[in-house]
Amino acid sequence: MRLPIFLDTDPGIDDAVAIAAAIFAPELDLQLMTTVAGNVSVEKTTRNALQLLHFWNAEIPLAQGAAVPLVRAPRDAASVHGESGMAGYDFVEHNRKPLGIPAFLAIRDALMRAPEPVTLVAIGPLTNIALLLSQCPECKPYIRRLVIMGGSAGRGNCTPNAEFNIAADPEAAACVFRSGIEIVMCGLDVTNQAILTPDYLSTLPQLNRTGKMLHALFSHYRSGSMQSGLRMHDLCAIAWLVRPDLFTLKPCFVAVETQGEFTSGTTVVDIDGCLGKPANVQVALDLDVKGFQQWVAEVLALAS
């Protein structure tokens, strides 16, 4: 039986790979997509997501979400993904539009209609998920779990300690981590290992139309290089759904720093239980890299 999922995303070049896997992995049933401001503005992430759905002829509803964080000014990652978020490939024109309601309400409505609890996957800032949990707490029993790409038990990637998706809206992340729902966190500890090698990248143009498109996007992606390999951060959240055996997880108490002058957005991961607080997150700490690379090759071969 395929696993029903809703995907909250901010495309973003590595998001495009994660979306491909969510659509084409035979184990998954992608039923709803929502967008959030993150890598670029929400208008751009929505445009990019619709372009990808049209490219794959995927009839999946999409709702546009939060344009700004809960409290603070927005930040982006255009330096990594380019000003448009997905530069490098000329997508054809289409007339697709997002749903006419905000993302968190679209998630609420879809959860309440679902015949069974649904897994939420968030690979951008957690603003939409925080709005859902704070404004619609009645939805919690209908959430099977939340799988996120975000955070780190060690170094950050936009500050010394903070990972971008959490740092972009720390208050939202803090709300989500306090919510009591089941959370799996695929942070930089594993995503920095999730590298597609130059040898594999060179085969993409011959793979299929998706391979050609992704190869064009990757030439503008600044999380590594075509010569040294590219990190597929967001793809790890999808990989865990399909191949949890590739990941080493540990239950930990995790809090999000929202006040620190130098540490705002840091995920404080209590690996050794120093704080004496009960675990609220399953934290991915290690990855079977070769197994991950093999799985990526298999799923992208299906993305025709």
Swiss-Prot record:
GO cellular component labels: cytosol
Record's keyword terms, sorted: Glycosidase, Hydrolase
The keyword Hydrolase is annotated on this UniProt entry: yes
UniProt xrefs under PROSITE patterns: IUNH
Active site positions, chain numbering: H233
HAMAP family: Nucleosid_hydro_RihC (MF_01432)
Identification of the protein by name: Non-specific ribonucleoside hydrolase RihC
Annotated source species: Escherichia coli (strain K12)
